[in-house]
Amino acid sequence: MAKKDYYEILGVSREADEREIKKAYKRLAMKYHPDRNQGDKEAEDKFKEIKEAYEILTDAQKRAAYDQYGHAAFEQGGMGGGGGGFGGGADFSDIFGDVFGDIFGGGRRQRAARGADLRYNMDLTLEEAVRGVTKEIRIPTLAECDVCHGSGAKKGSEPITCPTCHGAGQVQMRQGFFTVQQPCPHCHGRGTIIKDPCNKCHGHGRIEKSKTLSVKIPAGVDTGDRIRLAGEGEAGENGAPAGDLYVQVQVKAHPIFEREDNNLFCEVPINFAMAALGGEIEVPTLDGRVNLKIPAETQTGKMFRMRGRGVKSVRGGAQGDLLCRVVVETPVNLNDKQKQLLRELEESFGGPASDKNSPRSKRFFDGVKKFFDDLTR
């Protein structure tokens, strides 16, 4: 089945900048995150699809390859999958160069491959994301063999020059009227072979190993942010540089607050008496409780801004705000006395659409009356 266009998956144009892509990813990731859709296989697949699109389109090199060649750009090297908490990566820098080199005879001795990049998906609470945290993670990886130190050869020996290509890493083959160069089938393009392989890594130069890392998450990170740990990916072949580890941040849904950029939003219920008469209530912030003054005659939906009570930007600068949206709660489970008091209060208003006490209701019912009057003319 044909893969869906990455831009369509995120709902952005092909000209979208990184900020637009990140914003789209955050919105969709929150919607389809497995924590919010437990047991929903379709949502889980959609979440993986969104993550894959985000990882390609926020990497300048991979995005350029995708824009030019589409999904075919990643079919040879394979990209790190989005499943689970851990995934492998690939270096795409030489995919097309190697193809054209083989065709036109421009092949060369294959260099020792840099280690693959790794990805670790880290879930954070909102509090951890806002304040910053240091976490220990354990990752499986390929590490340099501690016996042969990456050479692949038994201790006391060294790799020898390949007798087939004489160290060139390439052999010439005739195809019709053309002579082309291809990687040596004996040494696989390395130019050397291991006659006496290391007993521990069996000539690979690397061994499977788990390692524990301490990762410092800076204050202010958000869903979609990525932290790079240089050299903490898989070990390279034959002493080549190691890849990098990318920690991908995902902030869990919070029971009270919602975050948008550096602002926090929360919904604050008040009873109708306080809405009418005004008063003071305690509202939560990430730094503790603070008092919020409610003016008399406050309506449902009124938004109160508490400056500097939001999230401090991870890149420095001003701190966001906390925006509290008031919701007037209708009382329930009334006793007889309370019901009687409310009836008396309603009578004192002069009906449900009093011009003085309920101007919005008055305007609404006047509009309804005019609407029906116009229909009957």
Curated annotation (Swiss-Prot):
<keyword id="KW-0235">DNA replication</keyword>
<keyword id="KW-0863">Zinc-finger</keyword>
<feature type="binding site">
    <location>
        <position position="145"/>
    </location>
    <ligand>
        <name>Zn(2+) 1</name>
    </ligand>
</feature>
<keyword id="KW-0479">Metal-binding</keyword>
<keyword id="KW-0346">Stress response</keyword>
<dbReference type="InterPro" id="IPR002939">
    <property type="entry name" value="DnaJ_C"/>
</dbReference>
<dbReference type="GO" id="GO:0042026">
    <property type="term" value="P:protein refolding"/>
</dbReference>
<feature type="binding site">
    <location>
        <position position="148"/>
    </location>
    <ligand>
        <name>Zn(2+) 1</name>
    </ligand>
</feature>
<dbReference type="GO" id="GO:0008270">
    <property type="term" value="F:zinc ion binding"/>
</dbReference>
<comment type="similarity">
    <text>Belongs to the DnaJ family.</text>
</comment>
<dbReference type="GO" id="GO:0006260">
    <property type="term" value="P:DNA replication"/>
</dbReference>
<feature type="binding site">
    <location>
        <position position="198"/>
    </location>
    <ligand>
        <name>Zn(2+) 1</name>
    </ligand>
</feature>
<dbReference type="GO" id="GO:0005524">
    <property type="term" value="F:ATP binding"/>
</dbReference>
<dbReference type="GO" id="GO:0031072">
    <property type="term" value="F:heat shock protein binding"/>
</dbReference>
<dbReference type="InterPro" id="IPR012724">
    <property type="entry name" value="DnaJ"/>
</dbReference>
<dbReference type="GO" id="GO:0005737">
    <property type="term" value="C:cytoplasm"/>
</dbReference>
<dbReference type="InterPro" id="IPR018253">
    <property type="entry name" value="DnaJ_domain_CS"/>
</dbReference>
<keyword id="KW-0677">Repeat</keyword>
<dbReference type="InterPro" id="IPR036869">
    <property type="entry name" value="J_dom_sf"/>
</dbReference>
<dbReference type="GO" id="GO:0051085">
    <property type="term" value="P:chaperone cofactor-dependent protein refolding"/>
</dbReference>
<dbReference type="GO" id="GO:0009408">
    <property type="term" value="P:response to heat"/>
</dbReference>
<protein>
    <recommendedName>
        <fullName>Chaperone protein DnaJ</fullName>
    </recommendedName>
</protein>
<feature type="repeat" description="CXXCXGXG motif">
    <location>
        <begin position="198"/>
        <end position="205"/>
    </location>
</feature>
<feature type="binding site">
    <location>
        <position position="184"/>
    </location>
    <ligand>
        <name>Zn(2+) 2</name>
    </ligand>
</feature>
<keyword id="KW-0862">Zinc</keyword>
<dbReference type="InterPro" id="IPR001623">
    <property type="entry name" value="DnaJ_domain"/>
</dbReference>
<feature type="repeat" description="CXXCXGXG motif">
    <location>
        <begin position="184"/>
        <end position="191"/>
    </location>
</feature>
<dbReference type="Pfam" id="PF00684">
    <property type="entry name" value="DnaJ_CXXCXGXG"/>
</dbReference>
<feature type="repeat" description="CXXCXGXG motif">
    <location>
        <begin position="162"/>
        <end position="169"/>
    </location>
</feature>
<feature type="zinc finger region" description="CR-type">
    <location>
        <begin position="132"/>
        <end position="210"/>
    </location>
</feature>
<feature type="binding site">
    <location>
        <position position="201"/>
    </location>
    <ligand>
        <name>Zn(2+) 1</name>
    </ligand>
</feature>
<feature type="binding site">
    <location>
        <position position="162"/>
    </location>
    <ligand>
        <name>Zn(2+) 2</name>
    </ligand>
</feature>
<comment type="function">
    <text>Participates actively in the response to hyperosmotic and heat shock by preventing the aggregation of stress-denatured proteins and by disaggregating proteins, also in an autonomous, DnaK-independent fashion. Unfolded proteins bind initially to DnaJ; upon interaction with the DnaJ-bound protein, DnaK hydrolyzes its bound ATP, resulting in the formation of a stable complex. GrpE releases ADP from DnaK; ATP binding to DnaK triggers the release of the substrate protein, thus completing the reaction cycle.</text>
</comment>
<keyword id="KW-0143">Chaperone</keyword>
<dbReference type="InterPro" id="IPR001305">
    <property type="entry name" value="HSP_DnaJ_Cys-rich_dom"/>
</dbReference>
<feature type="repeat" description="CXXCXGXG motif">
    <location>
        <begin position="145"/>
        <end position="152"/>
    </location>
</feature>
<keyword id="KW-0963">Cytoplasm</keyword>
<feature type="binding site">
    <location>
        <position position="187"/>
    </location>
    <ligand>
        <name>Zn(2+) 2</name>
    </ligand>
</feature>
<feature type="domain" description="J">
    <location>
        <begin position="5"/>
        <end position="70"/>
    </location>
</feature>
<dbReference type="Pfam" id="PF00226">
    <property type="entry name" value="DnaJ"/>
</dbReference>
<dbReference type="Pfam" id="PF01556">
    <property type="entry name" value="DnaJ_C"/>
</dbReference>
<dbReference type="InterPro" id="IPR036410">
    <property type="entry name" value="HSP_DnaJ_Cys-rich_dom_sf"/>
</dbReference>
